[in-house]
């Protein structure tokens, strides 16, 4: 099995200090695009409770096990750092420093390193030292309060909006931008502070603009894109399934109402006072047929209607299947790498890394034979941090990108 692929990040080396949630997902994105990601697992695992062979966020990576609380733990990680482009960590602020692998120690070994920090609350602020999870982060940014019906509690969007959209994706953008700077003439490494609260808030930029212009009410379930509009929402079918409707533009709306058979109610689109009447007409009509029936009715149209599928159903959808949006690897159906590149495509090259399984291989490929030697796992009490590495599903590691270190520490790669 190859260590890296032919994706656009081939040759980029990433050290990921094991965590759960957005940090590992960010590192997976980099690995999917060809980066050589080495995950530093802790003895006993990260505490996610998932069998490592099913943890898809660790695909395309290699793993070594290092006890950072042991006397030589930090030194082993720093040997990897010398040859890395990116480091990702998701501890609470100050923990990496107490473990001896904070930005100061890492940049002393490798000034060009992009040091990515993934947390929920950020590196500073009144809540920086508090525990948290996705739902709390999106709650205080106003994001959670936007989702759901006006007379019901906010709907919980799994952990996709905070952990992965507001966290992982912003971390990846940040470290890639920092890598570009580090590789520019006169550039250097730096710290990327990726906080889920910052990213989740940033996702709402357009909504804030609409609110300032008077086009968005600061309450859920009454606006154009939050379910308040009857032609942008989901409707139950006769078999208990759902169809999603997004017929916003008038020409799409006209096609939608014609195919649904409610042209008489179509003019209600222009009168919000009649929206309850329009919603009732749409709901009643969808309730007369199954999901399969309505899928066939709208197939090939520009009415912007789609069946609401389950996770297991999605891979078999004709469009998903034609594009290869899902792939089979390591006995599991899983999303293929995204986005797609015409010249340097990413791929799923290897299954989820098993803790410590690749130590000898990494020691050879990265030129750090010392990490393959037995570790003294008994920590000296003076070297233990006041509190061990604590991560939540949202306080994860962050990715960093630097240059090729194959010739040794401090050498810049070709620009």
Predicted ranges, named:
Residues 1-185, 353-354, 358-375, 401-415:
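N-terminal helix-loop segment corresponding to the beta1-alpha1 unit
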Residues 37, 299-313, 369-371:
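Short, well-structured beta-strand/strand-turn elements
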Residues 123, 152-161, 183-200, 220-227, ...:
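Conserved Rossmann-fold dehydrogenase catalytic segment
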Residues 226, 231-301, 305:
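Aromatic-enriched alpha-helical interface/lid elements that frame and gate functional surfaces
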């Amino acid at each position: 099995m190859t260590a890296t692929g032919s994706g656009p990040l081939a040759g980029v080396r990433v050290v990921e200090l094991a965590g759960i949630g957005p940090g590992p997902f960010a590192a997976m994105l980099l690995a999917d695009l060809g980066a050589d990601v080495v995950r530093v697992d802790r003895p006993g695992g990260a505490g996610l409770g998932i069998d490592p062979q099913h943890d898809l966020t660790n695909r395309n990576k290699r793993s070594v096990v290092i006890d950072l609380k042991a006397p030589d733990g930090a030194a082993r990680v720093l040997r990897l750092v010398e040859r890395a482009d990116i480091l990702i960590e998701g501890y609470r602020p100050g923990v990496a420093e107490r473990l001896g692998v904070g930005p100061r120690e890492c940049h002393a070994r490798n000034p060009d390193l992009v040091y990515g920090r993934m947390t929920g609350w950020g590196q500073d602020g009144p809540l920086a030292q508090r525990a948290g999870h996705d739902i709390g982060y999106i709650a205080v940014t106003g994001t959670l309060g936007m989702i759901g019906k006006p007379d019901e509690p906010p709907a919980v969007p799994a952990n996709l909006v905070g952990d992965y959209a507001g966290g992982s994706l912003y971390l990846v953008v940040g470290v890639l931008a920092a890598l570009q700077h580090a590789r520019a003439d006169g550039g250097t490494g730096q710290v990327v502070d990726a906080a889920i609260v910052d990213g989740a808030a940033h996702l709402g930029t357009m909504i804030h603009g609409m609110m300032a212009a008077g086009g968005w009410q600061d309450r859920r379930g009454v606006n154009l894109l939050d379910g308040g509009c009857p032609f942008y929402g989901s409707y139950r079918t006769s078999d208990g399934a759902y169809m999603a409707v997004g017929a916003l533009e008038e020409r799409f709306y006209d096609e939608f109402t014609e195919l649904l058979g409610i042209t008489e109610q179509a003019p209600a689109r222009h009168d919000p006072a009649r929206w309850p009447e329009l919603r009732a007409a749409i709901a009643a009509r969808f309730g007369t047929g199954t999901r399969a029936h309505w899928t066939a009715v709208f197939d090939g149209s520009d009415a912007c209607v789609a069946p609401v599928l389950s996770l297991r159903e999605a891979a078999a959808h004709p469009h998903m299947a034609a594009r290869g949006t899902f792939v089979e690897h390591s006995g599991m159906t899983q999303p293929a790498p995204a986005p797609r590149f015409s010249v340097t495509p990413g791929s799923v090259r290897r299954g989820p890394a098993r803790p410590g399984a690749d130590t000898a291989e990494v020691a050879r490929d990265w030129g750090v034979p010392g990490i393959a030697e037995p570790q003294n796992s008994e920590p000296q009490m003076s070297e233990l941090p006041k509190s061990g590495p604590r991560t939540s599903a949202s306080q994860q590691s962050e990715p960093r990108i630097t240059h090729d270190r194959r010739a040794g520490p401090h050498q810049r790669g070709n620009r």
